[in-house]
């Protein structure tokens, strides 16, 4: 498929919200509009002058959805979001026995099986927790429901920073007493006990699906570091296998122990958030530098054995947790060493330099070399680059950047995709170094209101409809086109296809499933759709 450039931001034209049938569908297929059912509430749109709208939520109202609908055999569900203001609106269609369309044909190839999906989610940073808890309790609950419940978009991944990061309001670790090599003074501060942990428990209670927790450290205690500071160029003192590295490895176990005391178990930890950052002079916020060779030896001699010999031996270890530009080199260094490789379950990647690193040459090549090591996208956000505005309320372009990234990652063997902060304030913070960025949910505490951005719904087109255990399958286009598309099978054998149109042109479209027939539809300009149907 060919990828078109993202559109220039323009102010939206108001759209009616009564029927979801686009006028351009006439003559192809009349998709039957589905009225808002008892559990579903429509978006209350608000424009801030960017290319689309946000949906406004407060203590008494928030848009919501019914659980995903799999209609009777021979029909399909279609969920639509558009730049003009539709937000995951449901319609139903009939699967045709014969192909009558003349446009693009996407053919499902269920016999071509690829990776199984782990899931989708976001990070419970200190900043996210502060913003959520600044709302009134009813508004807090609606925000958490929006992300984690069946009424929302069904997140099943939460990334948790181990101690502070830039999205904290102070710098701290869990062991700031100098030379405490036995970690006797290791303790969780109120950021964990009063903010993150209670919110994570509330999210787990709301979720219908099992939620997996992923932990990542930004910096070690400063007394373990060569530069004696949380930020800037610095790595662990000494060499792998020594007291500094062993202490840092045991810090991971102490963290897992402490959260277990609060009845929270982790699916995975990453060896270090962005290990390349701590190799850069003047790096502005929390970091800990590792070269690939240093990470290899730390995993082989310290972190891997320490986790394996602890009560947390089932916790998965993910390497890298940095830009995919570093692949496949970083993977080659670590995974060609059998002592390190035996402890590594997966490779975590961040999205920030993706424009410099084609997916095929990085993700694709890494999968070719190490097909049994999973790839997992662990962090993404927009607004972080110096030329970008931090927050653009209602930006459709930023939503398209998310869904384009998710589809590309899925097409190159990645098993999950994790957003950064679950919620930020209108400035894009708080952040102790003022590294403000955007978020799918922006909280305005002055109004006890939060805004669900296009990014939220673009993510929802995947997270709500692709449960853990779904498997990507083949999908072949009949001609070059400007759409991004991916197909998956649910564990029960039903099908899901997500189609993103980043161009201004409407694209007539047929999806062919050899088992059931043809789905005649259209992909309007600047839209994203999720299609669901039963195959038996």
UniProtKB/Swiss-Prot annotation:
Listed GO MF terms: galactosylceramidase activity; glucosylceramidase activity; glucosyltransferase activity; scavenger receptor binding; steryl-beta-glucosidase activity
Entry keyword annotation includes Lipid metabolism: yes
Localization terms from the record: Lysosome membrane
Any GO BP annotation: positive regulation of neuronal action potential
SS bonds (residue pairs): 43-55, 57-62
GO-annotated cellular components: endoplasmic reticulum; Golgi apparatus; lysosomal membrane; lysosome; trans-Golgi network
UniProtKB keywords: Cholesterol metabolism, Disulfide bond, Glycoprotein, Glycosidase, Glycosyltransferase, Hydrolase, Lipid metabolism, Lysosome, Membrane, Signal, Sphingolipid metabolism, Steroid metabolism, Sterol metabolism, Transferase
Membrane disposition: Peripheral membrane protein
Known glycosylation sites: 58, 98, 185, 309, 501
Signal peptide: 1-39
Reaction(s) this enzyme catalyzes, per UniProt: a beta-D-glucosyl-(1<->1')-N-acylsphing-4-enine + H2O = an N-acylsphing-4-enine + D-glucose; a beta-D-galactosyl-(1<->1')-N-acylsphing-4-enine + H2O = an N-acylsphing-4-enine + D-galactose; cholesteryl 3-beta-D-glucoside + H2O = cholesterol + D-glucose; a beta-D-glucosyl-(1<->1')-N-acylsphing-4-enine + cholesterol = cholesteryl 3-beta-D-glucoside + an N-acylsphing-4-enine
Record pathway: Steroid metabolism; cholesterol metabolism; Sphingolipid metabolism
One Pfam family it belongs to: Glyco_hydro_30C
EC number: 3.2.1.45, 2.4.1.-, 3.2.1.-, 3.2.1.46
Active site per the UniProt annotation: 274, 379
Family: Belongs to the glycosyl hydrolase 30 family.
Role of this protein: Glucosylceramidase that catalyzes, within the lysosomal compartment, the hydrolysis of glucosylceramides/GlcCers (such as beta-D-glucosyl-(1<->1')-N-acylsphing-4-enine) into free ceramides (such as N-acylsphing-4-enine) and glucose. Plays a central role in the degradation of complex lipids and the turnover of cellular membranes. Through the production of ceramides, participates in the PKC-activated salvage pathway of ceramide formation. Catalyzes the glucosylation of cholesterol, through a transglucosylation reaction where glucose is transferred from GlcCer to cholesterol.
Quaternary assembly: Interacts with saposin-C. Interacts with SCARB2. Interacts with TCP1. Interacts with GRN; this interaction prevents aggregation of GBA1-SCARB2 complex via interaction with HSPA1A upon stress.
Protein name (database record): Lysosomal acid glucosylceramidase
Organism: Pan troglodytes
């Amino acid at each position: 498929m060919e990828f078109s450039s993202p559109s220039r931001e323009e102010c939206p034209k108001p759209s009616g919200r009564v029927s979801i049938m686009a006028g351009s569908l006439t003559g192809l297929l009349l998709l039957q509009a589905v009225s808002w059912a008892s559990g579903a509430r429509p978006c209350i749109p608000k424009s801030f002058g960017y290319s689309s709208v946000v949906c406004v939520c407060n203590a008494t109202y928030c848009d919501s959805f019914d659980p995903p609908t799999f209609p009777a055999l021979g029909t399909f569900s279609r969920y639509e979001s558009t730049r003009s203001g539709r937000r995951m609106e449901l319609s139903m269609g009939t699967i045709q026995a014969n192909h009558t369309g003349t446009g693009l044909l996407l053919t499902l190839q269920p016999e071509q099986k690829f990776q199984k999906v782990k899931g989708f989610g976001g990070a419970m940073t200190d900043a996210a927790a502060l913003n959520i808890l600044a709302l009134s309790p009813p508004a807090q609950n609606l925000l958490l429901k929006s992300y984690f419940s069946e009424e929302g978009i069904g997140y099943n991944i939460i990334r948790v920073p181990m101690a502070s990061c830039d999205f904290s309001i102070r710098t701290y670790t869990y062991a700031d007493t100098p030379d405490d090599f036995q970690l006797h003074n290791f303790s969780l501060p109120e950021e964990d006990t009063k903010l993150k942990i209670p919110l994570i428990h509330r999210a787990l209670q709301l979720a219908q699906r099992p939620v997996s927790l992923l932990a990542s450290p930004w910096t070690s205690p400063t007394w373990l570091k060569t530069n004696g500071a949380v930020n800037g160029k610095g790595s662990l003192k000494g060499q792998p296998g020594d007291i500094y590295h062993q202490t840092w490895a045991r810090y991971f176990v102490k963290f897992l122990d402490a959260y277990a005391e609060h009845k929270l178990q982790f699916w995975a930890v990453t060896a270090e958030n962005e290990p390349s950052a701590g190799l850069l002079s003047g790096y502005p916020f929390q970091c800990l530098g590792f070269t690939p060779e240093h990470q290899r030896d730390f995993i082989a001699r310290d972190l891997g054995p320490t986790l394996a010999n602890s009560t947390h031996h089932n916790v998965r270890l993910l390497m890298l947790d940095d830009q995919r530009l570093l692949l496949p080199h970083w993977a080659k260094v670590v995974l060609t060493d059998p002592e390190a490789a035996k402890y590594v379950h997966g490779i975590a990647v961040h999205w920030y330099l993706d424009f410099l690193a084609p997916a095929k040459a990085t993700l694709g090549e890494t999968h070719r070399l190490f097909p049994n090591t999973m790839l997992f996208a662990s962090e993404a956000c927009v607004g972080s680059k110096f030329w970008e505005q931090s927050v653009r309320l209602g930006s459709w372009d930023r939503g398209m950047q998310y869904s384009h990234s998710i589809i590309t990652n899925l097409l190159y063997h990645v098993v999950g995709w994790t957003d950064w902060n679950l919620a930020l304030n209108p400035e894009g913070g708080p952040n102790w170094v003022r590294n403000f960025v955007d978020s799918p949910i922006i909280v305005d505490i002055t109004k006890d209101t939060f805004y669900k951005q296009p990014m939220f719904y673009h993510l929802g087109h995947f997270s709500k409809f692709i449960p853990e255990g779904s498997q990507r399958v083949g999908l072949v286009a009949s001609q070059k086109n400007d759409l991004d598309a991916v197909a998956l099978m649910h564990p029960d054998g039903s099908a899901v296809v997500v189609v993103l149109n980043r161009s201004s042109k409407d694209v007539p479209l047929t999806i062919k499933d050899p088992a059931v027939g043809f789905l005649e539809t259209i992909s309007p300009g600047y839209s994203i759709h999720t299609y669901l149907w039963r195959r038996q």
